[in-house]
Structures are given as C-alpha cells and as structure tokens.
C-alpha cells in the first residue's frame, strides 16, 4: 500500500508539472497570436482555465495510454525474465529506482537554482520568447513522454511485486492476475489523477450555482486547488526518493536487513516510521551520487570533444 501511495504521488507530481508547463506554453501561444507577449505569466486558475482546461484531460489520457502500453510491454517481459533469467529482475529494478532518485535530485537542484538566481525582467522575457517559439504540440508530446517514462519505472515495480506474489501459481493464473492488476491500477490511478486536475473546474461550476452553500464550496475549491498542486509537487518529489530509495535498499539484502534489524530494536512507533525515513534519506543520497556521476561523464565527454 505504501508503494502504491508513493507511486501515485510521484505520478501526480509528474503530471502536475507537465500540465503547468503546457499551461505556460498555451498561454504564450495565445498571446503570440494576439501579437502581444507580456511579462506577467502568473498562471492563476482564472487565467489558465480557458487554455489549460482544454488540455488537462487529453494530457492525462495521453499519459494513461502510454501507461497501458508500458504494462502491455512489462507483463510479458516480466514473465519471460522470471522464467529464463530471474536473477535479472532485482538489478533492473534497482537501476529504475536509482533513476527515480536521480530525477528527484534534479528537481530539487532545479528548484534551488531558480530561487538562487531570480530572473530579471529582460531574462524572463528572453526565456518566454524562446519558449513561445517552440511547437506547442511537440512540446506537449515531449512532456507526456517524460511522464510515461516515470510511469514505466513505477509500473515495473508494481508488476514485479505482483509477480512475486503469484510466482508459484500456474502460468495462466500469473498472466490473468498480472493483466488484471495492471488494468485496475492504470484505470484507478489515472482516473484519480483526472479528478484531481479538474478540481478548479469543479470549483468554477459550483461557484456559479444559486445556492450559497455551493458557492462557498466552489470558492473553497478554487482557493485549495493551486495549493493542492504545490503540495503534490513537494510530496511527489519526496515520493521519488521514497520509492527509488526503497527499491535500491530492497535490492541490497544486507542493507535492507540491517535497517529492519535496527528498526526492530526501537519502540513500535519508531520501528514503523524509521525504515521509511531511512529509505527517503538514502534515496536522496543515491540520487546525489547518480547526479554527480552523470555530470562527471558529461564533463569528460565535453573535454573529449
């Protein structure tokens, strides 16, 4: 359940970021068409609703379709690997987990960099003009591909866990259970994502009702919606470290057992929380190591050229 919840938060964060980027793109395109490119891109709910509302569900549907394709690939692949090279499952999952940690650290560094070096109006205008020059459809497709890539790693973990549960069952049962879980998870997760990203539209709809109670509820949703998306972004990034760190830790048996043993010596409450906290911290450390490794490789390649 913890993995499923963390995976959902990671996906929500990815899609929330994706929708924000596409919202900026859409608003820029609209301003460009009008022959105006303003400085103010504070994408509040009212400004974004005309553009963003048209693309929210298509974007979620695009990622959901990619998620289904991921599972169509992963289910038979998992069965083949399990049958012929079962030892490869754990290393492959660990690579995926390390990649999630890497993405989490990249997000944190990007956020810190943005806070450290705030743009002046000229830099902001230059960046926005560069963004506006891009093809909106290609931009959207590229963003969706990134979300589908994250989904692939999380889907692989869910498929692997399910396969571990039904490993001793006949092949037909394994296929049916894996396919059923894959379908239910995809429909459930992206159905919930679709509801969450339409909260602001629900708020507008309720705010226009004649009932004072409905209007108050609608206004409340409009106030909550942007804060909810910000909270999801923070919690989703933490979930990347939690899921990714957990995958890597589980793949290193001595480390996993040491954490479990240490947690078992603590009080009941601490024993329940400690493994999660340690997975989170280790996830950040793992991500940091991968980022340093990637930057070192990029530096060497730059020197080679």
Curated annotation (Swiss-Prot):
Topology feature Cytoplasmic, residues: 1-71, 114-151, 198-231, 293-305
GO-annotated cellular components: plasma membrane
Stated name of the protein: Inner membrane protein YedI
- One Pfam family in the UniProt entry: DUF808
Q: Which organism is it from?
A: Escherichia coli (strain K12)
Keywords, A to Z, come to: Cell inner membrane, Cell membrane, Membrane, Transmembrane, Transmembrane helix
Segments in the Periplasmic topological domain: 173-176, 253-271
Is the keyword Transcription in the record?
no
């Amino acid at each position: 359940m913890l993995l499923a919840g963390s995976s959902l938060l990671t996906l929500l964060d990815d899609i929330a970021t994706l929708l924000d980027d596409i919202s900026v793109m859409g608003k820029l395109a609209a301003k460009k068409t009008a022959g105006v490119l303003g400085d103010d891109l504070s994408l509040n709910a009212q400004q974004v609703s005309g553009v963003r509302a048209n693309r929210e569900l298509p974007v979620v549907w695009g990622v959901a379709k990619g998620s289904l394709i991921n599972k169509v690939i992963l289910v038979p692949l998992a069965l083949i690997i399990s049958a012929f090279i079962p030892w490869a499952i754990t290393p492959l999952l660990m690579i995926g987990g390390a990649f999630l940690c890497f993405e989490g650290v990249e997000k944190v560094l990007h956020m810190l960099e943005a806070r450290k070096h705030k743009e002046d109006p000229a830099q902001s205008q230059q960046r926005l003009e560069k963004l506006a020059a891009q093809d909106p459809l290609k931009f959207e497709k590229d963003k969706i591909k990134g979300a589908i890539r994250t989904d692939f790693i999380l889907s692989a973990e869910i498929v692997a866990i399910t396969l571990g549960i039904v490993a001793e069952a006949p092949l037909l049962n394994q296929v049916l259970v894996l396919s059923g879980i894959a379908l239910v998870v995809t429909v459930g997760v992206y159905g919930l994502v679709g509801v969450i990203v339409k909260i602001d539209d629900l708020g507008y709809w309720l705010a226009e009702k004649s009932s004072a109670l409905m209007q108050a509820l609608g206004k409340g949703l409009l106030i909550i919606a942007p804060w909810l998306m910000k909270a999801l972004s923070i919690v989703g990034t933490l979930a990347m470290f939690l899921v990714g760190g957990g995958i890597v830790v589980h793949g290193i048996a001595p480390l996993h057992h040491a954490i479990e043993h240490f947690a078992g010596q603590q009080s009941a409450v601490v024993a329940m929380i400690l493994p999660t906290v340690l997975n989170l911290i280790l996830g950040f450390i793992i991500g940091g190591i991968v980022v340093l490794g990637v930057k070192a490789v990029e530096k060497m390649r730059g020197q080679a050229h």
